[in-house]
């Protein structure tokens, strides 16, 4: 992905219309990470590893089909298939587009559950059963 399009530095044009010279070349840390890659509901789980600031690595989720659902009454976790996204409090449009984010309510094989992890950051979907 070309990150030059996401540079948010100062303009190189003065208010009078004259041109300013560059103070320094664009550094990688000033480019940002590009547009957010929000995980979607798909046919299988697809993950990728990305290098982030400080030389660390993050496992990001691109597509998801399964979630680790915690059942409070039974005090156990199950791997359940995600059937659909019911709603998303952060953005109503995310539910229509099948984006999975923290706080989203998903319909699974065992019932409705709330996503408690951050799939784009953690690379896994953890949820708690609500019905």
Swiss-Prot record:
Extent of Basic residues compositional bias: 17-30
Gene Ontology molecular-function annotations: structural constituent of ribosome
Keyword terms, alphabetized: Ribonucleoprotein, Ribosomal protein
GO biological process, one term: translation
Domain of life of the source: Archaea
Family membership: Belongs to the eukaryotic ribosomal protein eS8 family.
PANTHER family cross-referenced by the UniProt entry: 40S RIBOSOMAL PROTEIN S8 (PTHR10394)
Protein name: Small ribosomal subunit protein eS8
Species the sequence originates in: Pyrobaculum calidifontis (strain DSM 21063 / JCM 11548 / VA1)
């Amino acid at each position: 992905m070309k990150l030059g399009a996401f540079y948010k530095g100062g303009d190189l044009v003065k208010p009078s219309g004259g041109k300013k010279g560059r103070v320094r070349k664009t550094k990688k840390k000033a480019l940002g990470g590009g547009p957010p890659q929000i995980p979607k509901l798909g046919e299988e789980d697809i993950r990728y590893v990305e290098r982030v600031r400080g030389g660390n690595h993050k496992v990001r989720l691109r597509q998801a089909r399964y979630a680790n659902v915690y059942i409070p009454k039974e005090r156990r976790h199950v791997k359940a298939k995600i059937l659909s996204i019911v709603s998303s409090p952060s953005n109503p449009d995310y539910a229509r587009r099948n984006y999975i984010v923290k706080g989203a309510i998903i319909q699974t094989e065992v019932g409705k559950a709330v996503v408690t992890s951050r799939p784009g950051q953690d690379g896994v979907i953890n949820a708690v059963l609500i019905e």
